[in-house]
Amino acid sequence: TTTMEVGDCVLLVEAYQKPAFIGAGGLWAGLTQAQINARKAAINGHPDQSACHAWVNAFGSNGKAGVYFQRFVGNGTTGAILQSPNPTNNCELPSSAVYDPTRPETFHLPRCNAWNWAVNIWGTVPGSVAAQDTRDNVGVQYGLKALRDGVIGAEEFVTLNELVGGIDRDSNPRAQRSTADLGALETAYRSGIVASGRQLARMAIIDLRGWDDSNVTVPPGLNPPGAPIHHQWFSWAVRDRIVAESAAGDARNQALWRFARTGLAAPGTLGLEAF
């Protein structure tokens, strides 16, 4: 389920760079960069824009099948996107040896995206070597909380959801939303790839987590992390899932342990503190 946040960040970071937002006459024209970034943070659900930038740069290309030109955030303040001039692929093979979306004759060659790496789990699309896909954002209302909180206006909300679109199974952007293969979703839930709160409630959990939510907004004395992607909210999402699905309706089996000052890595005294 972490993949959902990565995919959403890729779509949102791309959408924010559209002329409808930052172009002459765009909805954010005339705003300061700080005001723009506050809107992005509210939409993303993060302390600031840096978390989505980190997801894009660290894992945003994992879903790319075959040959592609990597896109990445080149400016952590504005979110400006750059594209590599050189083709690459996730197989770590010569481009001639893998699938190339622009060359139909390579359709049968290795794809090496995150879903094809696990094709034996997901299965293939009928009549294709492509793996079935779990990604889906149909019906997602991006920025709804930001709208309700008054951080963005109705026009920004509508424009964002018109522009955000989705991706195809090769992770190419498209105007329509992403749609999952039902068989892949069934596999994800039945296999435990999507963690079951009912099952998690049956074990003792100590959730250890340091600060890795931002490289802009950081606790005093902490060096900013390079790629802030290990977010606090994941712990609470697991907790909510346990409460919702456990027989007892609570999460007494889960303890949350935090150590902000040392960043993501646990302090050296943790072993002693545990006793």
Enumerate the predicted regions with their spans:
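C-terminal His-loop and adjacent cap/lid subdomain of alpha/beta-hydrolase
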Residues: T1-F275
